[in-house]
Amino acid sequence: MKKRVVIGSRARSRAPEMLALLEQEGYELVLNPFDRTMTEDELIERIAGASAMIAGSDKVTRRVLETGRDTLKIVAKQGVGYNTIDVAAAKGFGIAVTITPGANSQSVADLTMGLILSAARNIPAMDRAIRAGKWYRHTGTELDGKTLGIVGMGHIGGGVAKRAHAFGMNILAYDVYPNESYTREYGVQYNDLDTIFRAADFISLHAPALPETIGMVNRERLKMMKPSAYLINAARGELVNEGDLAEALQTGEIAGAALDVYASEPPQVTELMRCENITFTAHAGAYTHEAIVGAGVMAAEEIIRVLSGQEPKYNVVK
């Protein structure tokens, strides 16, 4: 009997190269038939009897894992954020959970720089004005000589530092485990969070959603920022208190913001949506051809390793 692999990723996130690798191994592929993330019940319906799963934004709950526990060996996340997977339950059932570190780093770093530029020059406001028949020029700010504060210096944070350095920016950073090679290459200076929030002209978030980071950007921290400063979040929506951010934007406590991620996705219509000095994108940091192929192939390779009796490379279940 063929081993069955459930592909949770939507069609636009399924690289042909990923599917080809799995098909070459003779696996039966069960594809997500919807142009959206599958619900818990839809996953449960498909996971029974499966040997492996590739997860996109799917919420792989305890119920899902319990349904597949007799045959399921691995859930391979197509990306690095695994907060939608019940890792504790997976550990209890002996199921590996793997990630694809580095696969989308360049793409997210690219989008982050795009958001920084968009905020600095308020490109969306000019676009909206011209579409409405108005000739509007926004007086923006240059990046050269400005200070960028990066919170989280993993692969993505390092990629942002590389790009910001090329723009002539000074870089402050916070990370629990400082990587000194970034200091040598890009002049990154590590400091504490409060110092960074007070000193930076731009704050870019690249931290995971952990108990100690959820809600880290709140009213108190936003009040530390310069009135001319901008907040960028292309990491996890849970890091920012969106109500506090809306208030800071409306009262002029900070100059602007740009978000690619939200507390709930798709985001709810809130006061934040009514702010003019903010740019929104649709959690699109990893949505490039290169990142989709890279993450998909890495996830497929992890499945092949596990189903052939080998240890996975990037198992987050300890």
Set out the residue ranges of the language-model regions.
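Rossmann-like dinucleotide-binding domain for NAD(H)/NADP(H)
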Residues: 93, 97, 219, 228-318
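Structural/interface elements that position substrates and couple domains in central-metabolism enzymes
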Residues: 11, 107, 166, 172-180, ...
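Short beta->alpha connector loops at strand-helix junctions that form conserved
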Residues: 32-33, 78-79, 95-106, 194, ...
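Short, Asp-centered acidic motifs that coordinate Mg2+ and/or phosphate
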Residues: 51-52, 74, 202, 230, ...
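An N-terminal-biased, well-structured beta-alpha scaffold segment characteristic
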Residues: 1-98, 218-220, 224
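Phosphate-binding beta-alpha-beta segment of Rossmann-like dinucleotide-binding domains, i.e.
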Residues: 93, 101-147, 155, 162, ...
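Glycine-rich, N-terminal phosphate-binding loop of Rossmann-like dinucleotide-binding domains
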Residues: 9, 55-57, 79, 205-207, ...
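Rossmann-like adenosine-cofactor binding region
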Residues: 61-65, 176-271
